[in-house]
Amino acid sequence: MTSTRVALVTGGTRGIGAAIVRRLAADGFAVFLSGRTEESTKSALAHFAKEGVSARGFAADARSEEDQKRLVQSVARDGGRLDVLVNNAGLGHFDRVDKLSADQFRETLETNLFGVFYAVHHAAPLMIKNGGGFIVNIASLASVNPFAGGSAYNASKFGLLGFSEAAMLDLRHDGIRMATVLPGSVDTEFGHSRRDASWMLAPEDVAEAVADLVRFPDRAIPSRIDLRPSKPPKK
């Protein structure tokens, strides 16, 4: 078995996920990423190669259990192991609850919550077999702060935080540590465009938190990190 630590970053093609891929690769991990489509995955890998970032990847839809199962098994096969799983894939539909469609609500929960369950469910046995691992779930301060128009997104992120905290208790005695990162506003393509984004977190800030987490001594689980902009606009 290879001695190089292997990491998988879901939703690693852009934004926060891409920043995490870059940071873990710089820290010496063999990094795999997933994108929702073959096109987005190949495009991201080509871009990383031009940057000199070593990464491999697979297309996998977070909403599909079969895709997530195949993803983690492919990483373990090609990488020889799976040490770190970063669940970053996510999306959001935002509207009043009486305007939001059932399909939009369902897609948000299937991607942001069920997708994480699928990945953890199938990665955990592989990690246990190899003596443990670290799982980082990228949530949001929307996991604890509801907002108008956020019924689907809030539901998915509140659920993700609860899932993460319970799953951490399930797995810690098997050598698997789990942490949840709750970023505030991050300057990515995900959010609505803002005229001035200088006050917002950068994707690299979230990547730094992930890198710090996976370096923690085995005896400790920093199970939750709230990451806020230091100087948001005053209300």
Task: Annotate each predicted stretch with a short phrase.
Residues 13-14:
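Conserved glycine-rich cofactor-binding loop
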